[in-house]
Amino acid sequence: MNIVILAAGQGKRMHSNLPKVLHPIAGKPLAQHVIDTARQLSPEKLIVVYGHGGEVVRSTLAAPDLSWAEQAQQLGTGHAVAQALSELGSAAQTLVLYGDVPLTTVATLKRLLQAGKDALSVLTVDLANPSGYGRIVRDGAGNMISIVEEKDASAEQKAIREVNTGIMAVPTARLADWLGKLKNDNAQGEYYLTDIIALAVAEGMPVRTAQPEGEWEVLGVNSKVQLAELERQHQLNLAGELLVAGVRLADPARIDIRGELTHGRDVAIDVGCVFEGKVELADAVEVGPYCVLKNVKVGAGTRIAAFCHFEDAVIGPDGVLGPYARLRPGTELGPEVHIGNFVEVKKSIIGAQSKANHLAYIGDAEIGQRVNVGAGTITCNYDGANKFKTVIEDDVFIGSDTQLVAPVTVGRGATLGAGTTLTKDAPPDALTFSRPRQMTLPGWERPKKVKK
């Protein structure tokens, strides 16, 4: 089949400089959701009709399998599809989708395509409040004969609850002829794609319908209110899938998945968590409240406390992290590593059973196994122009308030005394410290303020 995605609308009610189809749901542009769904149908040609936002839309959505057609003037949906005619392949069916209707499922579209074998098929839905939608008009035998837009509908037609979603599968061989016969003598002065229904009926071609599993599948976005409503619906759908798969969610209404979340068994996720990019949670991982994980792999049995922020990191099994821990890109933690509150790790490898339990910065470092990093420890990795590496070998104990001025190496089994500023390599199995001699001045008095 061919698939044409209409993405030329301006979206005035969005009150935004960003083209409507580029506004995100679950961290991905509306139109990208539609494109990704379309790809699962393996179309012969996949064409995006763009207009408002022009090159921004093209550059954002660009992909080798996409063809493009420009609708310079927005003269209606029929006019929009006509711009794509020269790009269509020879496939028997052409499926028309909308770049601002992001949640239609592959299963629903397959039903629509099946209904449209040797016919024209339209996706319809019954709404409790059909206001604003084109109504499906049927004859006495129940056959669909036309779609009447809201602005052109009579009072009797406005009472119809079955409405047009705009999504349809059209016989490719008839599409160009039908589009050429469209007229714009309507309240909007536009060329409606829906008018091809009457043309098909006049030719004696059957017009069949299919319906989605849920109303949310065909909801479009025309305002920030609708964008927020659809975001919540989508997140509830994703949360429902997690629950069915065995994940324990403290509250399905308070989770955001903005990418791909895979998981093992007995995973638990508390409220307010955000998952971006590709996140993998192995068996028995626990994620505390209000954590952000972006492109992170977490090993089995690891516990993550509240308010952690991890990005582009790999966490080994049975770790204990947080609260308020931050892992920046390039971090790799081995098994049973502890990263505690207000500890930041960047582009560092930390070996098994090592601990940095509080108030530390570890950057551009390679830390061995069973290392204890005391509170207030800082790897001084940046001289204002270049980054340098710190190496801490196995079984090292680093006292509190220690600065390691890279490049520097701490040998296996070494101990660094509290308050040390290390500027040279520390030998293995020895105590290294640097601090001024402690002094006491008897009788010393603090300065006193003099009242003026």
From Swiss-Prot:
Entry superkingdom: Bacteria
Active site: H358
Protein location: Cytoplasm
Biochemical pathway: Nucleotide-sugar biosynthesis; UDP-N-acetyl-alpha-D-glucosamine biosynthesis; N-acetyl-alpha-D-glucosamine 1-phosphate from alpha-D-glucosamine 6-phosphate (route II): step 2/2; Nucleotide-sugar biosynthesis; UDP-N-acetyl-alpha-D-glucosamine biosynthesis; UDP-N-acetyl-alpha-D-glucosamine from N-acetyl-alpha-D-glucosamine 1-phosphate: step 1/1; Bacterial outer membrane biogenesis; LPS lipid A biosynthesis
Region (N-acetyltransferase): 246-452
Major place of residence: cytoplasm
Residue sites binding acetyl-CoA per the record: A375, N381, Y382, S400, A418, R435
Segments for region (Pyrophosphorylase): 1-224
Keywords, comma-separated and alphabetical: Acyltransferase, Cell shape, Cell wall biogenesis/degradation, Cytoplasm, Magnesium, Metal-binding, Multifunctional enzyme, Nucleotidyltransferase, Peptidoglycan synthesis, Repeat, Transferase
Subunit architecture: Homotrimer.
Descriptive protein name: Bifunctional protein GlmU
Species assigned in the record: Dechloromonas aromatica (strain RCB)
